[in-house]
Curated annotation (Swiss-Prot):
One of its GO terms (molecular function) is thymidylate synthase activity. It is an enzyme of class 2 (transferase). This is Thymidylate synthase. Pathway: Pyrimidine metabolism; dTTP biosynthesis. The gene is thyA. The active site is at residue 179. Pfam families: Thymidylat_synt (PF00303). PANTHER family: THYMIDYLATE SYNTHASE 1.
Amino acid sequence: MAHPEQHYLDLLAQVLARGDRRVDRTGVGTLSLFGAMLRFDLSKGAAPILTTKKVYWKTAVKEMLWFLTGGTNIRPLLQQNVRIWTDWPLAAYRRATGEEIGQAEFEARIVADEGFAARWGDLGPVYGKQWRRWLGPDGREHDQIAGLIETLRTNPASRRMLFHAWNVAEVGQMALPPCHMVYQYHVTSDGRLNALLYQRSVDLLLGAPFNFVGAAALQLMIAQQADLLPGELVWVGGDTHLYLNHLEQAREQISRAPRDWPRMQLVRRAESIDDYRIEDFAVEGYESHPAIAAEVAV
């Protein structure tokens, strides 16, 4: 049986071989395939943390925990040394002010100055806002995560167990429209929680490895809250692409042999979905190839 990571490497190879060359929003350009699927079995504790390059799994989990707070400002992320969202507010600040501020200085000002952070560190109504505080037409806010967990507990055969972040009325106010858009859940007859993540847009080299980890961590948390066991994580990509400045890095990654996947587990039972911390996650046996550097396209 093929190593589960091999399917990801095969997808990289397919994009390199058959991808449609396109000019994209960022101006960098991509090779793109439309429609992809990967399946990861979480039932035995293995976690989809890629081994053919180093993936900073704690950063991905911290991002997921931040989403669950409903927050939209990068300041709490930077306070935990998570810098993956800085590029968008930094670019907005430079455009608005004309100041050629460096990333490190911008981040330091966000952390040190709450007022500056409030003005320049907010991303608009992105993931957390939609997941936890979706604004209805009557002015009421809807907590999609709480509703999902309640349905898992009370009606696990439901086919309506999902949440999403594509709020048409607010997409234009977001620093970046949601890429990992829809999360749907399914409970098997033997009490396992399956998840399906649909991404409309997939940065296959940089973004997808983080999305795999974040979705798996979320699945563990939701399963625990609903007294279920983790099952399968199904990942579906829409526009699945490699940026043209990532092609050599993709070839380097494909050349590497996957190693055994690590195990991820929760070390305590949290009282609620809002009570998880990064210290609750333990990853054992993660031995990866070296990191592969690549620039984010903004």
